[in-house]
């Protein structure tokens, strides 16, 4: 069983199901989905931090709860932003091999500079080291460092401490090839997984963006309907 955690934001609910559909259709192993839904996490007493004016999604910080939500048990698990889609024929289970058991986490180590000053949702865009690294993560939940990712720490740590991985060390962050977090207009080569980080094609401004047809095809399958 491969556990997959997807960040949930009500403004991107269509993207959540589109991503899930693209994962299931090519899966070589059973998939267990958990959606990081902030109201549910808040009601459960797991998330209580105030909204950061710089955060653009509801799951900006809750993504780091993944090891805790797995009870820090052995077995590699995946977190994904919801604004992603797998290319046809891509098996998400291949990702876990990029996170050796002697590492805490594996990510695509982007060198990404945003092209605009506003993020999704209207939040201000801030360039910083390791930007987008946390948008796709393979965790080893039972390592010593991942066990430090408690609800208390995640609710009190700064965005820099979390998203720049100051809770671990550089030597314990494994690298995933960029084809697994491929950004339209930025990444080179052929993608396995496309990340519409500026906005999914469900948003009017990005309806016809690069590789939009891949997203729309998955959306139609997920909804079992035609969209004009």
List each language-model region with its residue ranges.
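Active-site-proximal specificity loops/subdomain of glycosyltransferases
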Residues: 31-70
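A glycosyltransferase accessory/donor-loop signature
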Residues: 1-5, 11, 17, 28-29, ...
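A general structural signal for short secondary-structure junctions and capping/turn motifs
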Residues: 57, 95-99, 126-129, 164-168, ...
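Short, surface-exposed amphipathic charged segments that create phosphate/polyanion-binding patches used
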Residues: 46-54, 119-124, 190-192
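Conserved catalytic core of nucleotide-sugar-dependent glycosyltransferases
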Residues: 97-161
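GT-A fold catalytic core of metal-dependent nucleotide-sugar glycosyltransferases
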Residues: 62-114, 138
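Zn2+-dependent metallopeptidase catalytic core
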Residues: 20, 24-26
């Amino acid at each position: 069983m491969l556990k997959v955690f997807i960040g949930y934001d009500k403004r991107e609910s269509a993207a959540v199901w589109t991503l899930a559909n693209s994962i299931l259709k090519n899966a070589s192993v059973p998939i267990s989905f958990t959606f990081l839904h902030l109201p549910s996490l808040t009601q459960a007493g797991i998330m209580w931090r105030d909204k950061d004016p710089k955060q653009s999604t509801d799951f900006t910080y809750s993504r780091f709860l993944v090891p805790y939500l797995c009870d820090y048990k052995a077995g590699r698990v995946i977190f994904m932003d919801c604004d992603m889609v797998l290319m046809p024929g891509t098996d998400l289970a291949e990702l876990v091999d990029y996170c050796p058991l002697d590492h805490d986490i594996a990510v695509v180590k982007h060198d990404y500079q945003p092209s605009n000053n506003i993020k999704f949702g209207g939040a201000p865009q801030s360039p910083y080291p390791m930007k987008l690294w946390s948008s796709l993560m393979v965790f080893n939940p039972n390592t010593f460092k991942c066990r430090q990712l408690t609800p208390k720490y995640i609710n009190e740590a700064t965005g820099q401490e979390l998203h720049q991985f100051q809770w671990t060390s550089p030597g314990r962050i494994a690298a995933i090839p960029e084809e697994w977090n491929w950004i339209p207009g930025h990444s080179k080569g052929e993608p396995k997984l496309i990340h519409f980080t500026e906005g999914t094609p469900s948003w009017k401004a990005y309806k016809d963006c690069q590789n939009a047809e891949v997203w729309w095809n998955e959306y139609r399958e997920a909804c079992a309907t035609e969209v004009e």
